[in-house]
Amino acid sequence: MEITLGTRTADTVRIYFEKSQHPEIQKFLPQKAQSVEEALEDYEKTLLPNATSYGRTILADGHYVGDIWSYCIDPEDEPNCMVSFCIFETSYRSKGIATTALNMFLALIREKYGVNTVGAFTFSHNHASLNVLQKNGFSIIEEFEEDGVLSKYLQFSY
């Protein structure tokens, strides 16, 4: 299976927003945008020259299966950012797609922004996300409870 990263568009943002409303995704991935309009506004901000977030689509054999993005990009003193990802097409999960996509995306954001470290938050019960992050060299830095849910902060250094 060929995994590639594609360009996000207003259409893919709409698709992603719709797919991310599924209860199974909602329990693993908190959503910032509460409406498709808000998601599109956030996307428009990523197109600005001084954007602090950047995303790509995840394609498996040309089929749009998920998204990956960095946010809180800080290229200054100690260049760093955060990363998040989601495979919304359930039939494409557990096939190594997210692992490959994250590996590609880490190289891309290093080249594009010169970051030295990348952080990620995930719920402690999200074993699939933890596996993807750890397979890509992320280490658990902290475990904490927020709103009654155990979460982990992981970090990757180049």
Role assignments for model-derived ranges:
Residues 1-27, 53-158:
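Acyl-donor (CoA/ACP) binding surface of acyl/acetyltransferases
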Residues 24-44:
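Conserved GNAT-fold acetyl-CoA-binding loop/helix
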Residues 46-52:
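Short loop/turn motifs at secondary-structure junctions and domain boundaries
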